[in-house]
């Protein structure tokens, strides 16, 4: 063993040695010979396309979350096999923030949720107050500190979970796509807070994230996974160069400055941020004797952007004709909607009125807590306004039966896809939505076969062929969204 290897082992807070894992009834391994060391105080970013094994790997780093299946290999935390650590010790030293915020909330008040973990670990009231105040300040929770958890938006719930975990000051903090339900401003603020905690407290961070432009500048190292294996490990510039060399599709997810750098021959270091990219561009342009403003004019003309745009147009043309044909008839409308969660609380939706035409694609935008999810729940009759009404096909939505409304008119995809799942496998879940398939004769049998064809068709469209026997809760966040 080399001196460098000895040094790495000495400084490693986490070691994963030849880890393999397969879910029950699955021939293909979700993790295949994964080996990795994480240094104490390191900021490690784990990335890869949906279903590559990121979430599965992270769940193995805390035994209460580890899925059932066939497993071999070794995981050491500070030199101790992670399976030999008690749940209490893991709770205190290894923080874990899940993708789904509702899976971690256990109390009904925001302030109590912040304090719950510390109370469970036996901290004194004075320490609890200090740490709760610290986290509330970090995350800007002061304005909703005394609110009921049920009143929070998905983004606010995730912020609360993050603050609750960080209040325990763990040695290692694992975050599985923590900003997936935050708006861009809140996500940026949160990631800055994570960087600050890593710098000030020396907490080791293992983060999976799709907003790579936000996290790459803070990352000490990046791990790229593909098909259950580690594809490459290195600093952000090294990862960019390696993915470009392999012509791997993950290169398209790299920060824009890295993608621009890859198109130009240069001896300068690879830029990560826009600021670094501007400096690099100035140096390159000076050497070539051209203006930065005109540096890529010829490149824009020569690149295959127009070809790609043309191909995209061809692909979407048939969908445009079928689904977005301009029509004047209004399919959904709301008139002067008002809603609040309690008589004593302020209104969340205030005098909202708008209409939606058939075939129209309508985007409802806004920051966390602005009433987006509440509005959608009113439009789908999941909540009832205390004033105003919703019209569907010109008819008051309250006059539709549940079966008629949700079978013939509305499909609702919730923020949390797990709220739809009721079966033990992906395949059973899909058949449940069409009423199941039973072999019968004549017309009933034909109806059952039509349902089977419908399910098989949607399986191909959403690329779920290899996941049919998997439990819905064992899927990654992206796979759960596709199933939902």
Where are the model-predicted features located?
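Catalytic Walker B motif of ABC-type/P-loop ATPase nucleotide-binding domains
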Residues: 173-176, 182
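Conserved ABC ATPase "signature" region
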Residues: 126-144, 334-337, 431, 446-467
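A short, flexible loop at the N-terminus of ABC-type nucleotide-binding domains that lies
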Residues: 6-16, 21-33, 65-68, 86, ...
